[in-house]
Structure formats: structure tokens, C-alpha cells
Amino acid sequence: MRYLILLLFPLLSYSQKIYSVKYESQSDIKVYVVDYESQSDLKVFKVDYQSQSKGNEGLWYFVDYESQSDKKIYFVDYPSQSDLKIYFVKYQSQSGWRNKSKQHLLY
């Protein structure tokens, strides 16, 4: 039984449901997308299915409606305007926090 749990644990990776708003005043968090991984607070991987949604590990599912979201974000034009700097990664295994002091923003 213990081995079964250890084998299934990686399958239990979850994401958050994110909605991108049009106006800054509607957002929970202001986000800036950086050019380099080393500049980011969070490395984000976009997941394909809503069923993977929960948790706070940089796995994001973008929903179509605000009411479906866990968090509403607004993409800003400059790093100084942001609460959180993110970098989009190519693989799910690369996602995660680089700056854990900002982790509270997505709870």
C-alpha cells in the first residue's frame, strides 16, 4: 500500500484556475511576464484540463469565466507595477516557486 501511494503522488499535482481580467481594479493580483526564468518569482506551466486545478505550485488553468476562477489576474506592462513576476515554462516539471515569500499571493 505504501508503494502505491508513492507511485500515485506525482499524479496528484494540481493547478489553480486563473481568469485574466481586462481592468486592473478587477484583479486579485497584478502579474508581469518576465523574459528570463531567473527574474521570476514563479515559474508557470499552463495545464490543459480543469480537472488538474487546485494547489499553489505554478500549474495554471485559464478559465473562460470569472466565476470559475480561484484567482483573477491582470497583466501589467512594467515589472514595477506587478505584485508577482512569472515566467512561462515548457514542461510541467519545471513549474514552481523561486521566491516563496510571494507564495501567499495565490492562496
Predicted stretch roles:
Residues 1-13:
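Sec-dependent N-terminal signal peptides
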Residues 16-107:
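Repetitive, compositionally biased segments used for assembly/scaffolding
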